[in-house]
A protein has these predicted regions:
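Alpha-helical transmembrane segments of multi-pass membrane proteins
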Residues: 1-566
Length: 567
């Protein structure tokens, strides 16, 4: 009889261990899913990824304290449905380009200005339009963060229910193992470039063992999965972006596609263009090919037949194709996004990546700078402007550590004597001034800045032995206008290229105040305590803040050591 009891006891414990493992698995899997998916569909969260992370943590924490409660579970499917419907249909709801309603926002650029323009049509008062933007910003961000918290309360309840059964050490060990499994599986799915329907399907399958007795919940899960079918064969999901890739109509008389448009996270990112002499001689006025040709020719108007070329931010291959057209002996092409590279390899009209003279490196630029022993006649920085962050646990854009003083110094060390660097960028004035100042600091003398107008405000910065030749090219030399008194240079210690000065944006501060006060109110109303209730709670509050700071610092520092492609 005792053996039977022992067997039943072990079975009971093993069953509960499995449930705790999968609850923890689901919690971390959904956390990464929401952060990754949300940032592609509602742009503001691409720059505020730490806030959805905090909302997930808050929901899981409250749920673990609550445990499973019928009232919370009854609301769970509807909270989840609302959250995923908002994310899925954000473009149709005009939520994708909700912007930052402060001066920092106005320096970001992009389609967010369409929101301001629409509001200005409703009123002639600029400040009223800004206040309306502020209201939209707060409603959208706080509303979405509230839905995230509510959804994760139930998931945290599953974890808490089974965690309390075990002694702390064993329970935490199972919880940690499940959490790591969730991270590994989601990372693997991102590596495979799977679409959101796969993430959502697997995520809700993980929750079925906890809710299988509730047919309404299962029906809602099925609805959420079904609404994620699509959006079409021309949409791809890389580890960093949602990518939409479309062929443009070929010019009259051409039988094949000569230009493709690549968008990331619903905004234009780059073209893949046929700029070959054969095509351009037959179709000299074809657009956007004619418009772009002069910019891609600049480096080779300075350095003819280079023996070795490094292209940083190779993308779909326009810069690589230009190097091959001008007789480059060998080209190292560095691109962090494997899906963009794959699209370029398959569809670029000139097929530059098929050339035996090209070596492809799927890597972070900084990591490549530190690893390579090669020296180059010509280094070309393509248009690297990033529209995402490199980690769910940081507030840095994917390209921030490329545009720092230390990065440019590393690139300079890869130049051969007499070599040339051409850095192209399309930014707002203070960003262009900052890049000018960083190049001057890295090389010891100012660059030549030529206004190309590519992508609206494109500038090509030239450093190296061919600067005098650069001044003879048929582009306006705007170097004098970019001198910036007392410039704030981006460094590895302060890599925020897109902030005009050392500050915390007001829009972010407002959100943080609302979150802190709202969290305290939530804890008081649901648990009867707040973080200010006594010394112990205040200590836990600051320990949590310290944890987030150390986590963010660790992730950003690790990216410098091994490259963001591996973080």
């Amino acid at each position: 009889m005792e053996k039977v009891d022992d067997t039943l006891s072990r079975t009971y414990v093993n069953h509960r261990s499995t449930k705790l493992f999968f609850a923890s698995f689901a919690a971390l899997f959904f956390e990464l899913l929401v952060i990754r998916y949300l940032s592609t569909e509602i742009r503001v969260f691409a720059y505020l990824k730490n806030l959805p992370l905090l909302a997930c943590f808050l929901g899981i924490g409250v749920g673990m304290i609550y445990g499973r409660r019928n009232k919370v579970e009854r609301l769970f499917p509807w909270d989840a449905l609302a959250l995923f419907a908002i994310i899925r249909f954000a473009p149709m709801l005009h939520l994708t380009h909700v912007g930052f309603p402060d001066s920092t926002y106005y320096r970001l650029g992009g389609q967010e200005f369409a929101v301001l323009a629409a509001l200005l049509k409703l009123t002639t008062h600029r400040w009223l339009a800004i206040y309306l933007m502020l209201a939209i910003y707060l409603i959208v961000t706080i509303g979405v963060l509230s839905l995230i918290t509510a959804t994760f309360v139930t998931i945290g309840g599953f974890v808490g229910e089974y965690l309390k059964i075990f002694d702390p050490l064993r329970g935490y060990g199972i919880n940690l193992a499940g959490s790591l499994a969730g991270i590994v599986v989601f990372t693997f799915l991102a590596f495979l470039a799977t679409p959101p329907v796969v993430w959502v399907l697997l995520g809700f399958l993980l929750l079925v063992p906890f809710l299988w007795r509730k047919p309404v919940v299962i029906a809602v899960f099925i609805c959420i999965v079904l609404m994620h079918l699509g959006p079409g064969k021309n949409t791809f999901w890389s580890p960093y972006y949602r990518i939409d890739f479309a062929a443009l109509t070929p010019p009259a008389g051409s039988a094949r596609t000569s230009a493709y448009r690549l968008s990331v996270n619903h905004d234009y990112h780059q073209w893949a263009l046929d700029l070959s002499p054969e095509f351009m001689s037959k179709h000299p006025n074809a657009e956007p090919n004619h418009y772009a040709l002069a910019t891609y020719e600049i480096p080779y108007s300075l350095v003819s037949n280079p023996t070795s070329v490094l292209v940083v931010g190779a993308g779909t291959g326009n810069d690589v194709a230009a190097a091959l057209r001008h007789g480059a002996g060998h080209v190292d092409a560095v691109e962090i996004d494997p899906v963009i590279l794959q699209l370029g390899r398959k569809y670029h009209p000139e097929h530059p990546y098929d050339s035996p003279r090209v070596s492809i490196h799927v890597d972070d630029a900084r990591a490549f700078f530190s690893k390579t022993a090669n020296k180059y006649d010509l280094i070309v920085f393509g248009f690297l402007d990033s529209q995402t962050l490199f980690s769910s646990f940081s507030s840095l854009r994917l390209d921030d550590y490329v545009y720092t003083l230390q990065s440019l110094q590393s690139a300079r060390r890869l130049m051969k004597p007499g070599g040339t660097m051409v850095l192209s960028f399309a930014g707002v004035p203070f960003v262009n001034q900052r890049i000018f100042a960083m190049l001057e600091a890295a090389f010891g003398h100012p660059p030549v800045a030529l206004k190309t107008g590519f992508a609206g405000s494109g500038i090509s910065f030239i450093e190296g032995a061919t600067q005098d030749r650069a001044r003879t090219l048929p582009f306006p030399d705007i170097s004098d206008s970019l001198h910036w008194p007392n410039p704030t240079i981006a460094t590895d210690s302060w890599p925020f290229l897109y902030l005009d000065h050392r500050t915390i944006p007001v829009s972010l501060l407002m959100l943080l105040v609302v979150i802190v006060l709202g969290t305290n109110r939530l804890l008081k109303s649901s648990l009867g305590v707040g973080w200010t209730s006594n010394t112990e709670y205040r200590q836990m509050f600051f320990l949590g803040a310290a944890f987030m700071l150390l986590e963010t610092k660790g992730i950003t520092q690790l990216s410098l050591q091994i490259g963001r492609a591996h973080v």
